[in-house]
Amino acid sequence: VGFKAGVKDYRLTYYTPEYQTKDTDILAAFRVTPQPGVPPEEAGXAVAAESSTGTWTTVWTDGLTSLDRYKGRCYDIEPVPGEETQFIAYVAYPLDLFEEGSVTNMFTSIVGNVFGFKALRALRLEDLRIPPAYSKTFQGPPHGIQVERDKLNKYGRPLLGCTIKPKLGLSAKNYGRAVYECLRGGLDFTKDDENVNSQPFMRWRDRFCFCAEALYKAQAETGEIKGHYLNATAGTSEEMMKRAVFARELGVPIVMHDYLTGGFTSNTSLAHYCRDNGLLLHIHRAMHAVIDRQRNHGIHFRVLAKALRMSGGDHIHAGTVVGKLEGEREVTLGFVDLLRDDFIEKDRSRGIYFTQDWVSMPGVLPVASGGIHVWHMPALTEIFGDDSVLQFGGGTLGHPWGNAPGAVANRVALEACVQARNEGRDLAREGNEVIREATKWSPELAAACEVWKEIKFEFD
């Protein structure tokens, strides 16, 4: 009688290879690198314990609850091919451990404490399976892909964007001028850089006003709906909401948020506001590489992408496969599908550890940006398909003739690639030829092709 005090082996309680996972469990795949001498079963069980009900010693209050009902369970361990010291530990968490509709709580539970654990040399969360029973407690993206196309009246092609550069230092009026020139030239969107908030050289309200003026002028002249991602990110959630409200009063179609630096709680509040008030929400992933770049420690971006779809956002940056920032093709396409599709089959070659069923949650448009230019257009059109936003910052504003011709060059290149694809041509093989043909009737594109013909972002 009573309880047996003392330190216990985690694997005795939390390593349960016979466990059959339930449809309502949240499943996690962790890449575990145990300290030398720690068996994988003990390390896997330690992860399950520390990210659910466990603590380092037996406590008498364990007797006041049903551990079997609430504990996380490490139900499978497999070696990582080519890595002697690493294992994939699969952990199942009962749904009752999590607050409904809170990405914040989900992450605090699953990754909050366990990453500093002494028995582990390194730990990486590779994937999460979110059951419909949990995902249904989230609103998800404010509008989603189809509603966005209907709002913008743009179909059958990727959308084109451009980040205004230099990202810091322009006055609000000059900033608005650059926005106007890009939109007038043929882009669908322009974008505040992620670190443009409200600095001494350009306060947020001035920027919002000049950008709204720019996009209305461009709309009137082109007959197309235009948008500028007004960055509402701020030092407090209240200030962020104030900026979003002002954007809505200006009648603009879209605002923006840095969801990792701003935090999931703020992001979810903003997403709810955006749905209630007809604003689209563009999400930038500033700070993601701090979390996801190491191969053996941190959180893979596909998990951050899933979390964003639950928290809410209509666009999110997803790497390029071809530009200046890292991204392996198959893995990138894996999380692009996780953002856009309703149902994604388990496929380890693309890094997808679990079959994910989003049921009817709206999709998110992946945004390709970072060091891309007109010569990349065929590859981007083929890799990302129609449901994407292609963002050329330097690839627009770096045009030798100026911003508007830079925008024209990108729009012509995109239309040429979409037309070629619709005619059944193979963009992977004939892409350069398609662009060259298009230069014949677009001097702007010809000039862009000349400037960027030699650029490569490859570091061997």
UniProtKB/Swiss-Prot annotation:
Q: How is the cofactor bound?
A: Binds 1 Mg(2+) ion per subunit.
**Which of the residues bear the PTM N6,N6,N6-trimethyllysine?**
K4
The protein's matches in InterPro entries, at most eight in alphabetical order, are given as: RuBisCO (IPR033966), RuBisCo_large_chain_AS (IPR020878), RuBisCO_lsu_C (IPR000685), RuBisCO_lsu_C_sf (IPR036376), RuBisCO_lsu_fd_N (IPR017443), RuBisCO_lsu_N_sf (IPR036422), RuBisCO_lsuI (IPR020888)
**Cofactor(s) required, per the database record:** Mg(2+)
Spell out the GO cellular component terms annotated for this protein, sorted alphabetically and separated by semicolons: chloroplast
Name the active site residues.
K165, H284
The enzyme class is lyase
- Tell me the residues on which N6-carboxylysine occurs: K191
Please list the residues that bind substrate.
N113, T163, K167, R285, H317, S369
Q: Which GO terms describe its molecular function?
A: magnesium ion binding; monooxygenase activity; ribulose-bisphosphate carboxylase activity
Q: What is its EC number?
A: 4.1.1.39
Q: For site (Transition state stabilizer), what residue positions does UniProt give?
A: K324
What superkingdom heads the lineage?
Eukaryota
Q: Where does Mg(2+) bind?
A: K191, D193, E194
List locations, semicolon-separated: Plastid, Chloroplast
State the function annotated in the UniProt record: RuBisCO catalyzes two reactions: the carboxylation of D-ribulose 1,5-bisphosphate, the primary event in carbon dioxide fixation, as well as the oxidative fragmentation of the pentose substrate in the photorespiration process. Both reactions occur simultaneously and in competition at the same active site.
Subunit structure of this chain's protein: Heterohexadecamer of 8 large chains and 8 small chains.
**PANTHER family reported in the protein's UniProt record:** RIBULOSE BISPHOSPHATE CARBOXYLASE, RIBULOSE BISPHOSPHATE CARBOXYLASE LARGE CHAIN
Q: What is this protein called?
A: Ribulose bisphosphate carboxylase large chain
Q: Gene encoding it?
A: rbcL
